[in-house]
Design a protein with these regions (language model features):
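N-terminal mature ectodomain segment of secretory-pathway/periplasmic proteins
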Residues: 2-5, 18-98, 146
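Short, Gly/Pro- and small/polar-rich lid/capping loops
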Residues: 13-17
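Intrinsically disordered terminal and processing segments
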Residues: 23, 73, 135-146, 157, ...
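Tryptophan-centered motif/residue detector
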Residues: 26-27, 43-45, 130, 190, ...
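Short, solvent-exposed secondary-structure boundary motifs
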Residues: 41-52, 63-71, 128-143, 164-170, ...
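Catalytic loop of the DD-peptidase/beta-lactamase superfamily, centered on the K-T-G motif
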Residues: 70-115, 224, 228-248
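Gly/Pro-enriched, hydrophobic low-complexity segments
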Residues: 154-248
Length: 248
C-alpha cells in the first residue's frame, strides 16, 4: 500500500511530466539531438579545454545511448552506453574503447585529469540524464520522494528526490530536482561521483517547445555549498546552450 508521502511524490512527478509535455508526446520519438555550445572551468580542470565548445549530440530515449560529434577530431564521434564507451571514426572503426568505464575513475578528485575516453563517458551520461528527465523517473527501478519546499530568490520550489537504478550511469545515485509553480525543472542538484563527489547546483532556463516537449535551452552549473546555496557567480563550472534541437 502506498503511503501519503508516496502519493504526494507521485502526484508531483505527474504534474512535472505533464508540464514538460507529457509521456505521450515524449514517447512519440526515440532520439533527441541538439547543437551544444559549452563553456565553464570544468573542461580545463579535467584536461580538455575547448573540447566541447561547439559539438552535436544525440541521445536515445528508449535506451541509455548517447553520441557526440565531432569529438576531439573532426572525423570522430562517440558511442556511449552505461557499460561501454567508444570513440569511432566516420567509417565506424574504433579509435579507442573502454568497458566498465566508471571503474576507471576510482580514487579521482576534482583535480584529476581525464583521458579522452573518460571525457566521452561523462559527456554521454550527462546529456542522456538531462534529455530524459523527468520522463524516465516513473520507469521501473526509479524511486522518488518529495522533499520539503525550497525558497530561492523569493520563489518557492517543490523538490523531488530521485534515486536512480544501479544500471543507469549518471552523476550520483540520488539527485534532487527543483520544480517551479508551472511544473518546470529549474534546478538540479547532484554530486559528481567520478570527480570525488564534487557538489553541483545546476540551473535550467529559457525553455522552448520542441515537437510538444519542453526543453531548457540554457544550463549553468555552480558549486553547491553546505547550506544548499550555490557559490555564485564564480566559478561557473559548466554552461550549456542548446540550439538546433530536434526529436526523431
Amino acid at each position: 500500500m502506498k503511503t501519503v508521502k508516496q502519493h504526494a511524490a507521485n502526484d508531483l512527478l505527474e504534474f512535472t511530466i505533464k508540464a514538460h509535455g507529457g509521456r505521450e508526446n515524449f514517447n512519440k520519438f526515440e532520439t533527441v539531438s541538439a547543437r551544444l555550445i559549452c563553456d565553464g572551468v570544468l573542461w580545463s580542470m579535467v584536461g580538455h579545454p575547448g573540447s566541447v565548445d561547439d559539438i552535436y549530440v544525440t541521445s536515445h530515449t528508449n535506451k541509455q545511448f548517447t553520441s557526440h560529434r565531432p569529438f576531439l577530431n573532426k572525423d570522430w564521434h562517440t558511442a556511449f552506453t552505461a557499460q561501454h564507451v567508444a570513440i569511432k571514426n566516420s567509417k565506424e572503426d574504433v579509435i579507442e574503447e573502454l568497458s566498465n568505464p566508471r571503474d576507471s575513475f576510482a580514487g579521482y578528485t576534482t583535480e584529476t585529469p581525464w583521458s579522452q575516453i573518460q571525457l566521452a563517458y561523462f559527456t554521454g551520461y550527462a546529456m542522456w540524464t538531462y534529455f530524459n528527465a523527468p520522463f524516465n523517473f516513473g520507469d521501473a527501478g526509479y524511486k522518488i520522494e518529495e522533499l520539503e519546499p525550497w525558497i530561492e530568490n523569493g520563489e518557492v520550489f517543490q523538490r523531488l528526490q530521485v534515486t536512480f537504478p544501479e544500471e543507469i550511469a549518471t552523476h550520483s545515485p540520488v539527485q534532487t530536482f527543483y520544480i517551479d509553480k508551472d511544473g518546470l525543472i529549474k534546478r538540479h542538484d547532484y554530486n559528481v561521483d567520478i570527480a570525488g563527489g564534487a557538489t553541483a547546483a545546476h540551473y535550467l532556463s529559457d525553455y522552448i517547445d520542441v515537437q510538444g516537449v519542453k526543453i531548457a535551452t540554457k544550463r549553468n552549473v555552480y558549486i553547491r555549498q553546505e547550506d544548499n546555496t550555490p557559490l555564485f557567480p564564480e566559478p561557473l563550472l559548466v554552461s550549456i546552450d542548446l540550439r538546433e534541437i530536434s526529436r526523431k
